[in-house]
Amino acid sequence: MVNILLVEDNPDDVKITERALKKGKVLNNLYVARDGQEALDFIYNKGEYTDPQKAPKPGLILLDINLPKVNGIDVLKKVKSDEKLRRIPVIMLTVSKRDEDIIRSYDLGVNSYIIKPVEFDKFVETIKNIELYWLLTNISPTE
């Protein structure tokens, strides 16, 4: 079973992602952080997430860019610069089509950059495709 951390402040996008992953082919534990600081607390077991049983190391991070408190770019930078975390696949799942966001994300080591579809069915299909590739097709280091 894989642990997925969804970092998303839009409650509708959280619900759609949860539903798509529940209907998917891979058993997963989905954890949700509603802002960048909460994501960092979860990843580093700080604040309300000091218990690693309640906040296990994610096997995949779905990360929005435009987040309250700490933005997604800064979360990505911290994760990818940490020797113990840098191999965790991080997927930017965002509405931002700005070239500077895309370039900066790849420069910092993002594994994939996906623009969130506006239509419900396409959003669900995108989440299912992420699951199929990153959790079934892709081979990640076991460490």
Which residues make up each language-model segment?
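Conserved acidic carboxylate
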Residues: E8
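C-terminal output helix
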Residues: E38, V118-E131, L135, I139-E143
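Two-component/phosphorelay signaling modules centered on CheY-like receiver
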Residues: P11-E38
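Acidic, metal-coordinating helix/loop segments flanking the phosphotransfer/catalytic sites
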Residues: V32-L60
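The feature encodes the CheY-like receiver
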Residues: P68, R86, R98
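Residue-level signal for the "D+5" position in two-component response regulator receiver
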Residues: V32, L67-V70
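Active-site residues of response regulator receiver
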Residues: D64, T94
